[in-house]
Amino acid sequence: MANITVFYNEDFGGKQVDLKPDEYKRDKLEALGIENNTISSVKVPPGVKAILYKNDDFTGDQIEVVANAEELGPLNNNVSSIKVMSVPVQPRARFFYKEQFDGKEVDLPPGQYTQAELERYGIDNNTISSVKPEGLKVVLFKNDNFSAGDTLSVTSNAPSLGAMNNNTSSIRITP
């Protein structure tokens, strides 16, 4: 069974604690050594997902995390409860910062990712240069929120993205 790992600092730094699938209110997190409002990044392997909540008792603002999240945006250092759930293992598309599958890489499962969500998972705006879809269909959008504009569909390894190289602001991944 896979666990998530929560970190006190962005980019997976600082104190870290593994959490197995379960529900964690503030008192349970504190019993595990996780102080309130200290989580800044989360590693989420295939087979689990996490829902992070601003308030105790699974209330308030929330974000669902389905892959490694280098930063948590508005919930950075602002998480008081967490649900960790087992989910079916899915293939993940792999995105690279450089052509020829080089440089920083980030894996994402099927889903829709706006620019804000891509940044949560470590993909800065306009930085993708090559893609391995791993059996999935990846659609790259030049504009955020999947809005009109240039797109590129990728169903096989793409060592270069042509006009979409370093020009992607949102992504849709489907089986």
From Swiss-Prot:
Q: Which stretches does the entry tag as region Connecting peptide?
A: 87-90
**Domain of life according to the entry:** Bacteria
Q: What keywords sit in the KW lines?
A: Repeat, Sporulation
Pfam families, from UniProt? Crystall
* Protein location: Spore, Perispore
Name any Gene Ontology BP term.
sporulation resulting in formation of a cellular spore
- Residue span(s) of domain Beta/gamma crystallin 'Greek key': 2-46, 48-86, 91-135, 136-175
Please verify whether the record's keywords include Calcium: no
Q: Does the keyword Repeat apply?
A: yes
Major place of localization? other
Q: What is recorded about the protein's domains?
A: Has a two-domain beta-structure, folded into four very similar Greek key motifs.
As for family, the record states: Belongs to the beta/gamma-crystallin family.
- The protein's name in its UniProt record: Development-specific protein S homolog
Q: Which organism is it from?
A: Myxococcus xanthus
